[in-house]
């Protein structure tokens, strides 16, 4: 594969952008190569600066559930920009998207729009602290909730990609308020809650973990968290930035039937533009400024372009049969890759929830961060490079989720499975 222009651009980027990228995982460091620079995308394909085409399973890290450049979304954005990109004032579009989100997500009675998933989780935690009058928060090893200081503790994903669980620059006095439990282990949660009784404001969790690969919740795990939080007066926050509108229209909480007190969203609800949101019970959300004393603000929050893209995306997701078709496509490709590995005698552990899936390079089950961390990352790196040479674009890290979109055709999926079979045999 010819990638000389991408290599040249990366060298140029290193002179002006720290690490040459604006988000660490894009650097391809964990797979030992230089990143591809993307020029354009359409449907299920992306095209790099050297003219190579790839079937895309990154989907801009999740938002592109419709595929790239969906004509209805693009047309709506073009029409919206003619009216102005941002006003710093309320618009009817904000109300429309808010009502669509409230209608879709079981836990959300009121919602505030922001500009990123990090803003959403950061603000949700501040609100939970304000609501409860407590300082401590509880999260899970390997779950990533953005790069705010309180949440960069055993954070999985980008940090895990480089083998660094924490970040310099996070004050110890702040980090001490972040308690860390083991994902899928209710006993670890109960022990921390008992040891810190009356001091925990919230438990925040990816209800389907997507930042240590795709790790589904064990039976009873989410229900157990709901019970503990209800008993102890702790706010339960589902971080559905990744899973919201992805595994079902109403997210994981619809799929599993467990309702948190608050939910954070992002990615899909912006239709590919920068957006985040957090919402929940009215009694909690009503404490948010200017209605209440918990402060949060943002210059571009609810900007008309992101709201327009989100509205058009959710309209398309609500079409009859959308998620059934997506489920069939996702099952086909995930099961096909798993079978290809088995036929080649190559040990992987395959997981999937809806259109999120992962092939863990492990012979043992993966159910938390410790089990995920045992994966053979060198073998994954070889697989990643081999798949890239076959025209398949996967996330450049073992600890990320692959995403299927509605634009992936049967031919695309079959080509992907055939490529995987070839690569597993070569490995």
UniProtKB/Swiss-Prot annotation:
Q: Which GO terms describe its cellular component?
A: cytoplasm
Reactions catalysed according to its record: (S)-4-amino-5-oxopentanoate = 5-aminolevulinate
The entry lists its GO molecular-function terms as: glutamate-1-semialdehyde 2,1-aminomutase activity; pyridoxal phosphate binding; transaminase activity
Biological pathway? Porphyrin-containing compound metabolism; protoporphyrin-IX biosynthesis; 5-aminolevulinate from L-glutamyl-tRNA(Glu): step 2/2
Q: What's the superkingdom here?
A: Bacteria
Biological processes per GO annotation = protoporphyrinogen IX biosynthetic process
Which cofactors? pyridoxal 5'-phosphate
Q: Which residues carry this modification: N6-(pyridoxal phosphate)lysine?
A: 267
Q: Does this UniProt record's set of keywords contain Coiled coil?
A: no
Q: Which HAMAP family match?
A: HemL_aminotrans_3
Q: How does it assemble?
A: Homodimer.
Q: Record's family?
A: Belongs to the class-III pyridoxal-phosphate-dependent aminotransferase family. HemL subfamily.
Q: What is this protein called?
A: Glutamate-1-semialdehyde 2,1-aminomutase
Gene for this chain: hemL
């Amino acid at each position: 594969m010819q990638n000389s222009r991408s290599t040249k651009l990366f060298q140029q980027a290193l002179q002006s952008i720290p690490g040459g990228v604006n988000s660490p995982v894009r650097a391809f460091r964990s797979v030992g190569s230089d990143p591809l620079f993307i020029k354009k995308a359409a449907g299920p394909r992306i095209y790099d600066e050297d003219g190579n085409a790839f079937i895309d399973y990154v989907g801009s890290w999740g938002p592109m559930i419709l595929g790239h450049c969906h004509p209805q979304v693009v047309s709506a954005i073009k029409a919206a920009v003619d009216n102005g990109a941002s006003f710093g004032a309320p618009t009817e579009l904000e109300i429309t998207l808010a009502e669509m989100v409230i209608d879709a997500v079981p836990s959300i009675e009121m919602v505030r729009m922001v500009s990123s998933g990090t803003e959403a989780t950061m603000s949700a935690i501040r609100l939970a602290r304000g609501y409860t009058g407590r300082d401590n928060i509880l999260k899970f090893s390997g779950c990533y909730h953005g790069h705010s200081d309180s949440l960069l503790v055993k954070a999985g994903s980008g940090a895990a990609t480089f083998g660094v669980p924490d970040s310099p620059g996070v004050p110890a006095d702040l980090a001490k308020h972040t308690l860390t439990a083991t994902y899928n282990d209710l006993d670890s949660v109960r022990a921390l809650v008992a040891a810190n009784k009356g001091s925990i404001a919230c438990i925040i969790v990816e209800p389907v973990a997507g930042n240590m690969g795709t790790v589904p919740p064990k039976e009873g795990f989410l229900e157990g968290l709901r019970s503990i939080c209800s008993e102890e007066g702790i706010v339960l926050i589902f971080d559905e930035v990744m899973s919201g509108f992805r595994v079902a229209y109403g997210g994981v909480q619809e799929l599993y039937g467990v309702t948190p007190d608050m939910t954070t969203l992002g990615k899909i609800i912006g239709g590919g533009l920068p957006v985040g949101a957090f919402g929940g019970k009215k009694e909690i959300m009503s404490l948010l400024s200017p209605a209440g004393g918990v402060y949060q603000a943002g210059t571009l929050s609810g900007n008309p372009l992101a709201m327009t893209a989100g509205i058009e995306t959710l309209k398309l997701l609500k079409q009859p049969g959308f998620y059934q078709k997506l489920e069939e496509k996702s099952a086909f490709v995930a099961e096909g890759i798993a079978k290809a590995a088995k036929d080649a005698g190559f040990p992987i552990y395959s997981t999937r929830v809806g259109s999120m899936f992962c092939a863990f390079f492990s012979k043992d089950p993966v159910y938390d961060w410790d089990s995920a961390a045992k994966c053979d990352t060198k073998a994954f790196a070889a697989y990643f490079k081999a798949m890239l040479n076959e025209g398949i674009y996967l996330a450049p890290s073992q600890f990320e989720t692959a995403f299927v979109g509605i634009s992936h055709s049967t031919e695309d999926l079959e080509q992907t499975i055939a490529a995987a079979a070839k690569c597993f045999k070569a490995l």
